[in-house]
């Protein structure tokens, strides 16, 4: 058993407050340590009943979905870092978990994810999400640009973490709340080159054997209906974000609208590709 008690200095690395470089008071911090100690133990032993009281209703719902995502287990040393953001919420970051799925007769697909636990002001876990990864997180948290402050960085990071988690856990009801009713959603798919013996008319979709991207345009309702079918037809879906560019669109003077362009590696039991996700997000 590679579990280390969070009371050990080797198991928990106490980080500075991300907003003002002040350590959380020892008595205040200890509450979070005790909660995470019990949660980590429950994940390892699969005795989840003992931690239900540490979650809000919504937080417990997401936690139950996350631990049912394939075969879940903690990997690494179980080290957790505590951060207090501009909103005052405390998040426990750095925990790595692996999630494995059987593929075909003898195959296995495993994803390793950073898992983030977010606490409310009553020290209850109100949300659990997959982290963005070091590169994407640093691109947001270290960015200096007009319209940016610590609150903006926190909101954007949280939004993208929840977005990624919702698709992986097939949380269609949550995804419905992300898009506006007037949203236009364009989805691209890689069309594989046709074999050499196909007709000339069929070959016209592929130039010199290169992959072609097929685009489909949806309104919100048709996109969600299609996404529901995708969720039903795939045992697993996983999204991994890489580099990103985020810009505040200053022309919306009375609103905080951000253009997000982020590298995305999409993997499912039936299809996989790499591309870019572009979102216009109104943070007003």
Region spans (language model):
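Short beta-strand edge/turn micro-motifs at domain boundaries
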Residues: 3-5, 10, 104-152, 251-261, ...
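Acidic, serine/threonine- and glycine-rich low-complexity intrinsically disordered segments
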Residues: 129-216, 220-244, 248-253
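Generic preference for hydrophobic/aromatic residues in regular secondary structure cores
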Residues: 13-16, 53, 62-65, 71-72, ...
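Short, low-complexity N-terminal intrinsically disordered segments enriched in polar/charged residues
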Residues: 1-45, 124-169, 177
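Residue-identity detector for glutamine
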Residues: 4-7, 22, 30, 50, ...
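Sequence-level detector for tyrosine residue identity
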Residues: 3, 14, 28, 32, ...
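Surface-exposed, charged secondary-structure patches
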Residues: 59-118, 199-274
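Short, well-ordered alpha-helical segments enriched in acidic and aromatic residues
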Residues: 34-67, 170-198
């Amino acid at each position: 058993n590679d579990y280390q008690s969070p009371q050990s200095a080797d198991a928990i690395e106490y980080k500075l407050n991300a907003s003002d470089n002040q350590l959380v008071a020892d008595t205040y911090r200890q509450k979070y340590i005790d909660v995470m100690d019990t949660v980590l133990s429950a994940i390892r032993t699969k005795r989840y009943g003992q931690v239900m009281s540490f979650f809000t209703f919504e937080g417990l719902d997401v936690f139950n979905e996350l631990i049912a995502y394939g075969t879940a287990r903690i990997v690494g040393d179980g080290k957790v870092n505590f951060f207090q953001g501009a909103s005052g919420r405390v998040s426990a970051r750095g925990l790595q978990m692996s999630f494995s799925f059987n593929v075909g007769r003898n195959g296995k697909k495993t994803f390793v994810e950073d898992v983030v636990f977010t606490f409310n002001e009553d020290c209850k876990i109100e949300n659990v999400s997959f982290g963005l990864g070091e590169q994407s997180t640093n691109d947001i948290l270290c960015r200096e640009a007009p319209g940016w402050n610590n609150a903006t960085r926190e909101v954007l990071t949280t939004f993208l973490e929840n977005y990624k988690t919702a698709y992986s856990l097939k949380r269609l009801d949550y995804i419905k709340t992300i898009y506006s009713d007037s949203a236009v959603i364009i989805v691209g798919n890689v069309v594989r080159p046709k074999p050499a013996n196909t007709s000339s008319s069929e070959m016209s979709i592929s130039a010199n054997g290169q992959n072609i991207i097929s685009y489909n345009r949806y309104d919100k309702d048709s996109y969600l209906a299609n996404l529901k079918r995708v969720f039903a037809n795939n045992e697993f879906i996983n999204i991994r974000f890489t580099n990103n560019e985020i810009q505040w669109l200053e022309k919306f003077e009375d609103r905080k609208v951000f253009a997000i362009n982020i590298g995305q590696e999409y993997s499912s039991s039936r299809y996989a590709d790499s591309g870019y996700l572009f979102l216009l997000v109104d943070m007003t």
